[in-house]
Amino acid sequence: QFLYLPGTPTLLHAGTTRPQLSSCYITTVTDDLAHIFKCLSDNAQLSKYSGGVGNDWTYLRGTGSLIKSIDVQSQGVVPFLKLVNDVTTVINRSGKRRGATAVYLETWHLDVEDYLDLRRNTGDERRRAHDINTANWIPDLFMQRVERDGRWTLFSPDEVPDLHDL
């Protein structure tokens, strides 16, 4: 009767040495270089075994924000998303499908405008990511401001650490 049918990756790996019970994995990336590269490695491993991947990148500080430990300004989210894009294209899912990655960012993030340009066909290719899917979390407050032609303020997450959890 097909009352339940698992996702394609689950079916693909059933009965193999690498079975998966989930076809998609969602993670949150923190504002820490070691964690960023751990997430890139995790994405590659999950993709290798047919998992689709989604990453929330909202916690990364915005472009120009100070990285106090080395006293330099951050280059923001976009260069890391370029790496995510490249990992996605290099790893094919079990040799059968290309990698699939979605990246998420809040509408108040300082880098949201550059983020929205990631998939454009024009501009600096070092700031483009054509092979990942972008998603933007849009709160009701944003839409209310749009309706009223109101102001919207952008922040770097290191300046408002609790905003993402509201």
Locate predicted features:
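Extended catalytic cores of very large enzyme megasubunits
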Residues: Q1-L166
